A protein has these predicted regions:
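Glycosyltransferase donor-sugar binding loop
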Residues: 36-37, 167, 197, 224-237, ...
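Short His-centered aromatic/hydrophobic patch
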Residues: 88-94
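A short, active-site helix/loop in glycosyltransferases that binds the activated sugar's phosphate group
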Residues: 136-160, 167-171
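Conserved donor-binding/catalytic core segment of Leloir-type glycosyltransferases
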Residues: 187-204, 210-213, 226
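Nucleotide-activated donor-binding/catalytic signature segment of Leloir-type glycosyltransferases, i.e.
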Residues: 237-255
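Short alpha-helical donor nucleotide-sugar binding micro-motif in glycosyltransferases
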Residues: 263-268
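Aromatic "clamp/platform" in nucleotide-sugar-dependent glycosyltransferases that forms part
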Residues: 276-277
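Short hydrophobic beta-strand element within catalytic cores of glycosyltransferases
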Residues: 293-296, 303
């Protein structure tokens, strides 16, 4: 099967998608969209893309000339290599779904979560999404929340599947060696580590996490906060510097999701993920599989998947007092998740091999019906 994925060039999770298609007759292509304002680090992630053919493209949502150039370049690659499916991850790239579909390409659209959850009040986005949904061959997403948000924006209710992102539990598990991350970044062995794996942007409420640094350091001065994001945020960085917290904050740039991230989770006493909206956050699942004490905001994606105070900790959105209390209780040792139960729960429902089978089934169905003009 010949498959091409299209999403942000700095996507930390594209490798797991490529892993779905590692059989001898599979070939994976990656159209890596790079924001124009970040051309200085254009090739940063390339060293991590060993199992796919990468085409890096500059993307500017307002530059139609560039969008047309990108489309023709991708179409040339698709036609030359007989790519059977183009899987577009994140509706931010819906325009390419429209253009490639009009050129006869089999396009799958993937609702990424916030892209559809937060788009409801933008008329231009709604129209673009509606057209893309109408032309594509199928829609996938990782949660019921994202699926319903997409349907409200025009996604069809048929050929519309929920497929969890999936994680490789042979990589993310309780046997990951401890101390590797701390040693690499010269963090004392007995230090506490609080890790935020989310992008440094307001949606992820990074400011609320920063608010906890001072009070935590007052009681636990040997604590380090680690932020992982390819995208820098000068506002947050300046605030941390002005408040004299630099010596207790570590910024990580692009991190290989499978070669490096497991060691960060394993050495983290706490992993925090408290965005305003979310769908099915794989960083949360990975951290849980590695035995981390994970704190999440009370969003609909959780549903009945996990139990509060057992596999993870749930705090009310924007309740900074509750967040701080959770952190303090964990650092004091008064509370701790059941790592074994958390890992087993993840393995049973979220191992990537389960997702692989589901996605292959959808692709195969579309390829077999490739002579149909539309499926909807």
């Amino acid at each position: 099967m010949r498959v091409a994925f299209l999403t942000y060039s700095f996507s930390m999770h594209i490798n797991i998608k490529a892993k779905y298609f590692s059989k001898s007759n599979d070939k994976v292509y990656f159209f890596a969209m790079h924001p124009r304002q970040r051309t200085k680090d254009l090739d940063a992630p390339l060293e991590y893309r060993n199992n796919m053919v990468v085409t890096q493209l500059i993307h500017d949502d307002m530059d139609w000339e560039q969008i047309i150039k990108n489309t023709w370049k991708m179409f040339g690659t698709i036609r030359k290599n007989k790519v059977q499916i183009v899987h577009i991850i994140d509706m931010a790239f819906a325009i390419y779904g429209i253009l490639l579909s009009l050129l006869g390409v089999n396009v799958i659209l993937e609702n990424n979560g916030s892209d559809v959850i937060l788009a409801s009040n933008d008329p231009k986005l709604r129209k673009r999404y509606e057209v893309a949904y109408k032309l594509c061959r199928g829609v996938v997403q990782d949660s019921y929340v994202a699926q319903q948000a997409g349907i409200k924006l025009g996604a069809p209710s048929t050929n519309n599947e929920i497929i969890e992102l999936g994680i490789d539990t042979s990589i993310f598990n309780l046997n990951v060696e401890k101390g590797v991350f701390k040693e690499k970044y010269n963090i004392p062995k007995d230090a506490k580590v609080i890790f935020s794996p989310r992008t440094l942007r307001p949606l992820c409420n990074i400011g609320e996490i920063i608010d906890t640094i001072k009070p935590v350091l007052e009681q636990y001065p040997n604590t380090y906060y680690v932020f992982c994001s390819q995208i820098r945020n000068i506002t947050y960085e300046n605030r941390i510097k002005q408040e004299g917290l630099n010596n207790h904050v570590i910024y990580l740039g692009y991190i290989d999701n499978e070669k490096e991230m497991p060691y960060i989770y394993r050495d983290s006493d706490i992993v925090i993920s408290i965005p305003n909206s979310d769908s099915s956050p794989r960083s949360v699942y990975e951290a849980m599989a590695c035995g981390s004490n994970v704190i999440v905001s009370d969003l609909p994606w959780i549903g009945d998947k996990f139990t509060n105070n057992k596999e993870l900790y749930i705090v009310k959105l924007h309740d900074e007092e509750e967040l701080l209390n959770r952190i303090m209780n964990i650092l004091s040792g008064r509370t701790e998740i059941n790592a074994e139960i958390a890992f087993n729960g993840i393995k049973q429902i979220l191992d990537y091999r389960i997702s692989e089978k589901k996605l292959r089934k959808i692709y195969t169905k579309i390829i077999r019906r490739k002579n149909d003009k539309r499926l909807f």
